[in-house]
Amino acid sequence: MAPRHTDRLVLRRWRIEDREPFAVINADPEVMRFIGAGAVLGRGLSDDLVVRFEREWEARGFGLWALSARGDVDERLLGFCGLTVPMFLPSVLPAVEVGWRLAREAWGLGYATEAARAAVAFGFSECGIEEILSIVDPQNERSLRVCAKLGMTDRPDRTHPATRKRVRVLGVRLHS
């Protein structure tokens, strides 16, 4: 699949050279604070995620894109955004989730919203998905603001089976 472009971003498939900067992102406690149990990931687990992301593209025709700034000749990894099946929360299945994770230096620039809008549009227009969810820690105000900008509304809250913490489930429908 060819890369996609927004006004400021390139949404592309993962490359081997993305693994090192992705491991740095996943080792940042602030980045990981609201993800699962909030634990940082070591290099091996981080690399495993990249493999899983690519397999999801092959199996489903959608997945999580690597993000780079448009015009950055090095295509330095800023993080990821895209669509995935939230297997970690079986109570919402069958479902598709839009998710994102950005390096801290990319926070506050509107990149998550810009990339998530592109991912949701892709899901609706090219994948035939009718509803897209986002599963968010209730204390993650930044991600909740992104969800609001996407027009997402609350669905019933759930309990994360691994952490036993409440998570907010928000969604947007194709024709809403």
Could you say what each language-model-derived stretch is?
Residues 1-34, 51, 66-176:
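Acyl-donor (CoA/ACP) binding surface of acyl/acetyltransferases
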